[in-house]
Curated annotation (Swiss-Prot):
PROSITE patterns: ALPHAVIRUS_CP. Pfam families: Alpha_E1_glycop, Alpha_E2_glycop, Alpha_E3_glycop, Peptidase_S3. Coiled coil: none annotated. Changing residue 646 to A: In strain: Isolate MM 2021. Structural polyprotein: As soon as the capsid protein has been autocleaved, an internal uncleaved signal peptide directs the remaining polyprotein to the endoplasmic reticulum. Residues 190-200, 226-230 are annotated as: Dimerization of the capsid protein. It comes from Getah virus (GETV). It catalyses: Autocatalytic release of the core protein from the N-terminus of the togavirus structural polyprotein by hydrolysis of a -Trp-|-Ser- bond. Keywords: Capsid protein, Cleavage on pair of basic residues, Disulfide bond, Fusion of virus membrane with host endosomal membrane, Fusion of virus membrane with host membrane, Glycoprotein, Host cell membrane, Host cytoplasm, Host endoplasmic reticulum, Host Golgi apparatus, Host membrane, Host nucleus, Host-virus interaction, Hydrolase, Ion channel, Ion transport, Lipoprotein, Membrane, Palmitate, Protease, RNA-binding, Serine protease, T=4 icosahedral capsid protein, Transmembrane, Transmembrane helix, Transport, Viral attachment to host cell, Viral attachment to host entry receptor, Viral ion channel, Viral penetration into host cytoplasm, Virion, Virus entry into host cell. InterPro entries: Alpha_E1_glycop, Alpha_E2_glycop, Alpha_E3_glycop, Alphavir_E2_A, Alphavir_E2_B, Alphavir_E2_C, Flavivir/Alphavir_Ig-like_sf, Glycoprot_cen/dimer_sf. Residues 58-110 are annotated as: Disordered. This is Structural polyprotein. Residues 120-268 form the Peptidase S3 domain.
């Protein structure tokens, strides 16, 4: 069956009741009775007219205003009525109480829901008891499947229901005649407050929550309404989370039914709980009358409670027997939570230090100290009972305690708790105290008793609360932020925590015996005394009156007070009455709950930005944590607690860093390529510029260039010298040879062996003018040839610029391209230019807005702090006892012989043979485990999900898709498939530990192999499962002589040790800038790898050429350019167009990234673009519609060393060369190359000439 109701059948909605009117509506007089046979048509018409007038008048008066009150007559009538009432009161007083408790009126939300619920919900009953509700929603009737019983409606009860275990619902079609009673439903659930039977329901973060106590078993099936009266969810149960309860609900989305079940949910079906008495079962809330009330039969009532202690309805039975099912008692809500304490009593217990360094049996002995609350509050359990007077009733300012065998009371104002100083007591109830204490190594509790004596007990206890947040403060701040924490909730209402109670032992008291003339007198004093005398025979028994044992001595008798009509706490310092584990249970007040704590925010540090580093000046008011990490592949995490003024220098790279100071939010910064010098200046400025960016590469390049220049000059000089020598050698060896004038000039030959230039040229002019002109043109021709060679060389070298080589290797999306690879970097835009015949080019932009890498987890176990349960020891007087087997974690049991325990009244045993003590202990989960535990997981393949913004044409839409190469999403008619990602990387190891909101890569022991004092010393599948494993090296020790106690040794909690030594979490050291989050465990925004994209874009997404503007004469002029800065370049494009419109803009090289994807074309023919580049001399091709041009710029370095955003361009892999630097290199290389080529040419020519001779 479809569990989504329809909205088709609505004849009416709920009709509000008529408004309440304090006045009485006058009734019309009844018409006289007329016999039908005697009525004439005229009379009938008159009667019909009267009837219509009466109905109209009645309707008008009901909807009209209140009638005016008469002035005299009603007052007299009222006065007479008051007088009559006074007379009646004097005669017979009313049985009502003087101050009856007013019934709480329902609020506006409750009234609204009650009106709607009158029609659409029906009770579900089992054996006459309401167990839940069924709701009419749309065209269906829905009932929770776990609610047992039959709907209290004959038409609905006989329907055939289809059950769904997935949704915990039973569903059937509504009968036709009831469809008008059904409620509408809606899947729209904006965050805010909704209504249900018990008031407001808060909806936030996909969860419905209510104040704890507003819902209870029996509310299953109740609907939750919005303000329009539409059903948004059906309640199934709830999970107690402290101050609030999370509801388990069935609700609807647009297309399907969903069920939300928070952890720890309990079904709210009011199932009938049964208890047993003498093999006869009865409802726990209605105990049998023999016994049924503690005040009438206390001892029998306690035995009945002990027989039912493990039954689910135990607390219903406890409440019923304490209140005796008297409804008048329930109205006293202030004392309701203290009713159970009348069945208990305080006790005296052994205390090793009673404040003066000596042991005693103290009425305020300290049993336990709990410090699980992260806000520093502690909970102390003592032997006295607070908030109860000696009569057993609630009295807030009293403390009742045991003094001997008597119950006494003292003022609560004298109660004090000390560590290194006085503690602030925040709450008290029964055996428990909650207080804020300063750090210390001991704890003492004391009070002034009724005789003004100080009763105290001191124990060794190290109180050093861990800081909440990242600052170790001592005083709650006026201003700060709220962070999650745990605290003890100051409520005395019943909780899920409980303590065991048992029947107290017989208390020996030698003062009950007195010697009188050879006889022993037992003075009962109104108590029941159990006595045992060895003189004579038959001197064993109990008595409630004074008794004399003849011919006996005190040393031969043993007397003890016995009282089994009250419970006392199962203390390890007090023996239990019998070996059987008979016990009762009572709730523990002040439960641990999740809360928020206000923590201070450290003063903002003074920050000085430097070149690729920042200096923070820190002024802590208290120890404050400083952490930082790199956002690259190597995070290099660092943390330090700082308690005084310091300065710290943090290195910053282009990959970015993240630092956090105290409770301030984390700050992310990135370095820019700032430097001194200019990339477009003189050679020394260019060298200084590159030295600031790439010092090692610059030194190597300048050294190599200098060496090349020196070598070139030396080689040229050597070649010229060699050529000169070869030219002059023949003339030097020939006697009388004359060196020609030209050769002499070129080779610097001595003038003595050659004619002058004028004489040589005059001779050639006279003898041969042709040779004259050739001789004159030879040097000129050589110069012209050399210049042409250098020019061609420079033209060939210019295209080999490094910048051009980089740009040539950049992939560009061509026409009909339907695949792409985008970088997995949040905020880094990827753009592709798509050209199709007959269509205007279109720019496709893909930008990753967020990624989530979620591993598949398998929960191995949870671990937390343990508590050691030590039941009261059983002492067998004059005999032996044996250990019993128990299925308890780390259960230990030992029997010690030869013990002679003493209590405050004397020896506990009186016999000639040895006594034995049975000591037991075992381990259980601490009560804090529900709030403070670590979960050990095995992590498997991680699934990546990305949120990507897709822009093309007029479409700009965000979509979420799995990056696996299979998941396809449709955006604006186009289909996109992302993945799989190029790098199969995850920050999570195979084994991880999740603790609160932190994740740790840790190799933990498998289930069942925990070691004492290590992580995993106790293990269980959940915080409530019965499969608890423990290995804590628990060992029992022999009790000290004369003392009742259960000593033991045990390894400290491995979980608490792990908390102190767990190190840095993955949240603070994950590489690639990953942000680790929990619920579910995931890594967000990890900048690693690339995402392949396959797309199918339909033709409808393109613009036809005839519809797009025709752009011609496109030219680009760069006005401002700052490289390595986020869109620090501004380019102005001028063009001509035939009409206005919209054109796609795209850069065809990854040298520059253009911010705009499309621009509006206007008739003025001018647009401005912003671009980002890492090159000092970028040259990139830009297209606007179908027109293209090349933009060339001379960029300057950025001025800001550190910026709070990452770069939006591709970084250069190798050092980039500016155009000016290339020009200087070309000039120097050209000059040196020309000189070297000239030397080579001269040497070759001379060599060739000399070889021909």
């Amino acid at each position: 069956m479809n569990y989504i109701p329809t909205q088709t059948f609505y004849g009416r909605r709920w009709r509000p009741r008529p408004a309440y009117r304090p006045w009485r509506v006058p009734m019309q007089p009844a018409p006289p009775m007329v016999i039908p046979e005697l009525q004439t048509p005229i009379v009938q018409a008159q009667q019909m007219q009267q009837l219509i007038s009466a109905v109209s008048a009645l309707t008008t008066k009901q909807n009209g205003k209140a009638p005016k009150k008469p002035k005299k007559k009603p007052q007299k009538a009222k006065a007479k009525k008051n007088e009559q009432q006074k007379k009646n009161e004097n005669k017979k007083p009313p049985p009502k109480q003087k101050n009856p408790a007013k019934k709480k009126k329902p609020g506006k939300r409750e009234r609204m829901c009650m009106k709607i619920e009158n029609d659409c919900i029906f009770e579900v009953k089992l054996d006459g008891k309401v167990t839940g509700y069924a709701c009419l929603v749309g065209d269906k009737v829905m009932k929770p499947a776990h609610v047992k019983g039959v709907i209290d409606n004959p038409d609905l009860a006989k329907l055939t229901y289809k059950k769904s275990s997935k949704y915990d619902l039973e569903c059937a079609q509504i009968p036709v005649h009831m469809k008008s009673d059904a409620s509408k439903y809606t899947h729209e659930k904006p965050e805010g407050h909704y209504n249900w039977h018990h008031g407001a329901v808060q909806y936030s973060g996909g969860r419905f929550t209510i104040p704890t106590g507003a819902g209870k078993p029996g509310d299953s099936g109740r609907p939750i309404f919005d303000n329009k009266g539409r059903v948004v969810a059906i309640v199934l149960g709830g999970a107690n989370e402290g101050a609030r309860t999370a509801l388990s609900v069935v609700t609807w989305t647009k297309d399907m039914v969903t069920r939300y079940t928070p952890e720890g949910t309990e079904e709210w079906s009011a199932a009938l709980m049964m208890c047993v008495l003498a093999n006869v079962t009865f409802p726990c809330s209605e105990p049998a009358c023999a016994p049924c009330c503690y005040e009438k039969q206390p001892e029998q009532t306690l035995r009945m409670l002990e027989d039912n202690v493990d039954r689910p309805g135990y607390y219903d039975l406890l409440e019923a027997t304490m209140t005796c099912n008297n409804s008048a008692r329930h109205r006293r809500s202030v004392t309701k939570h203290f009713n159970v304490y009348k069945a208990t009593k305080p006790y005296l217990a052994y205390c090793a230090d009673c404040g003066d360094g000596q042991f005693c049996y103290s009425p305020v002995a300290i049993e336990k100290i709990r410090d699980e609350a992260s806000d520093g509050m502690i909970k102390i359990q003592v032997a006295a009972q607070i908030g109860i007077n000696k009569g057993g009733t609630h009295e807030h300012n009293k403390i009742r305690y045991i003094a001997g065998h008597d119950m006494k009371e003292a003022n609560r104002d004298s109660l004090q708790v000390h560590t290194s100083g006085v503690c602030a007591i925040r709450g008290t109830m029964g055996h428990f105290i909650v207080a804020y204490c300063p750090p210390g190594d001991e704890l003492k509790v004391q009070f002034q008793d009724a005789e003004s004596h100080t009763q105290a007990c001191k124990v060794q206890y190290k109180h050093a609360p861990a800081p909440v947040g990242r600052e170790k403060f001592t005083v709650r701040p006026h201003f700060g932020i709220e962070v999650p924490c745990t605290t003890y909730q100051l409520t005395t209402a019943p909780t899920e925590e409980e303590i065991d109670m048992h029947t107290p032992p017989d208390i020996p008291d030698i003062t009950l015996l007195s010697q009188q003339s050879g006889n022993v007198k037992i003075t009962a004093g109104g108590k029941t005394i159990r006595y045992n005398c060895t003189c004579g025979s038959g001197n064993v028994g109990t008595t409630s009156s004074d008794k004399t044992i003849n011919s006996c001595k005190i040393a031969q008798c043993h007397a003890a007070v016995t009282n089994h009509d009250k419970w006392q706490y199962t203390s390890s310092f007090v023996p239990r009455a019998d070996q059987l584990s008979r016990k009762g249970k009572v709730h523990v007040p002040f439960p641990l709950t999740n809360s928020t704590c206000r923590v201070p925010v450290a003063r903002a540090p003074g920050v000085t930005y430097g070149k690729r580093e920042l200096t923070v000046k820190l002024h802590p008011d208290h120890p404050t944590l400083l952490t930082y990490r790199s956002l690259g592949a190597d995070p290099r995490p660092y943390e330090e607690w700082i308690d005084r003024y310091v300065e710290r220098t943090i290195p910053v790279t282009e990959d970015g860093i993240e630092y956090r100071w105290g409770n301030n939010p984390p700050v992310r910064l990135w370095a820019q390529l700032t430097t001194e010098g200019k990339p477009h200046g003189w050679p020394h400025e260019i060298i200084l510029y590159y030295y600031g960016l790439y010092p090692a590469a610059t030194i190597a390049a300048v050294s190599a260039a200098g060496l090349a220049v020196v070598l070139s000059l030396l080689a040229s000089c050597y070649m010229f010298a060699t050529a000169r020598r070869k030219c002059l050698t023949p003339y030097a060896l020939t006697p009388g040879a004359v060196v020609p004038v030209t050769l002499g000039v070129l080779c610097c030959a001595p003038r003595a062996h050659a004619a002058s230039f004028a004489e040589s040229m005059a001779y050639l002019w006279d003898e041969n003018q042709t040779l004259f002109w050739l001789e004159l043109a030879t040097p000129l021709a050589a110069i012209i040839i050399l210049v042409c060679c250098l020019k061609n060389l420079l033209c060939c070298c210019k295209p080999l610029s490094f910048l051009v080589l980089v740009s040539l290797g950049t992939p560009v999306v061509k026409s009909y391209e339907h695949t792409a690879t985008i970088p997995n970097v949040v905020g880094f835009p990827y753009k592709a230019h798509i050209e199709r015949n007959g269509f205007s080019p279109m720019t496709l932009q893909l930008e990753v807005l967020g990624t989530s890498l979620e591993p598949t987890l398998n929960l191995e176990y949870i671990t937390c702090e343990y508590k050691t349960v030590v039941p009261s020891p059983y002492i067998k007087c004059c005999g032996t006892s044996e250990c019993r087997s128990m299925e308890r974690p780390d259960y230990q049991c030992q029997v010690y012989t030869g013990v002679y325990p003493f209590m405050w009244g004397g020896a506990y045993c009186f016999c000639d043979t040895e006594n034995t003590q049975l000591s037991e202990a075992y381990v259980d989960r601490s009560d804090v485990c529900k709030h403070d535990h670590a979960a050990a997981y095995k992590a498997h393949t991680a699934a990546m999900k990305a949120t990507i913004r897709i822009s093309y044409g007029n479409l700009n839409q965000t979509t979420t898709a799995f990056v696996n190469g299979e998941h396809t999403v449709t955006v604006g008619g186009s289909r996109f498939t992302f993945g799989p990602i190029s790098t199969a990387w995850t920050p999570f190891d195979n084994k991880i530990v999740v603790y609160k909101n932190d994740v740790y890569n840790q190799d933990f022991p498998p289930y069942g192999s925990g070691q004492p004092g290590r992580f995993g010393d106790i293990q269980s599948r959940t915080v409530e499962s019965k499969d608890l494993y423990a290995n804590t090296a628990l060992k029992l020790s022999r009790p000290s002589s004369g003392t009742v106690h259960v000593p033991y040794t045990q390894t400290p909690s491995g979980f608490k040790y792990w908390i102190k030594e767990r190190g840095t979490s993955l949240n603070d050291k994950a590489p690639f800038g990953c942000v680790i989050k929990t619920n579910p465990v995931r890594a967000e925004n990890c900048a690693v790898g690339n995402i392949p994209v396959s797309m199918d874009i339909p033709d409808t997404a393109f613009t036809r050429v005839i519809d797009a503007p025709a752009v011609t004469n496109l030219e680009c002029q760069v006005a401002v350019c700052t490289h390595s800065s986020d869109f620090g370049g501004i380019a102005t494009l001028t063009f001509k167009t035939d009409k206005p419109g919209k054109c796609a803009v795209h850069s065809h090289s990854n040298v520059a990234t253009i911010q705009e994807a499309a621009v509006d074309i206007k008739t003025d023919g001018k647009i401005t673009l912003h671009f980002s580049t890492a090159s000092a001399s970028p040259a990139f091709k830009v297209s606007v519609c179908s027109a293209k041009t090349t933009c060339m710029a001379a960029c300057e370095p950025p001025k800001d060393h550190i910026v709070p955003y990452g770069a939006s361009h591709n970084n250069q892999v190798f050092p980039d060369m500016s155009g000016t630097a290339m020009t200087w290199v070309q000039r120097v290389a050209g000059g040196l190359g020309g000189l070297t080529l000239a030397a080579v040419a001269v040497l070759i020519l001379v060599t060739c000439v000399t070889m021909r001779r």
